[in-house]
C-alpha cells in the first residue's frame, strides 16, 4: 500500500 502513502504525500505537497 505504498501508493496510498505516495498519493497522500503528493496531495499534501500539491
Curated annotation (Swiss-Prot):
Keywords for this protein: Amino-acid biosynthesis, Aromatic amino acid biosynthesis, Leader peptide, Tryptophan biosynthesis
GO biological process, any: L-tryptophan biosynthetic process
Superkingdom assignment: Bacteria
Purpose: This protein is involved in control of the biosynthesis of tryptophan.
Protein name: trp operon leader peptide
Gene name for this UniProt entry: trpL
Amino acid at each position: 500500500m505504498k501508493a496510498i502513502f505516495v498519493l497522500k504525500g503528493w496531495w499534501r505537497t500539491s
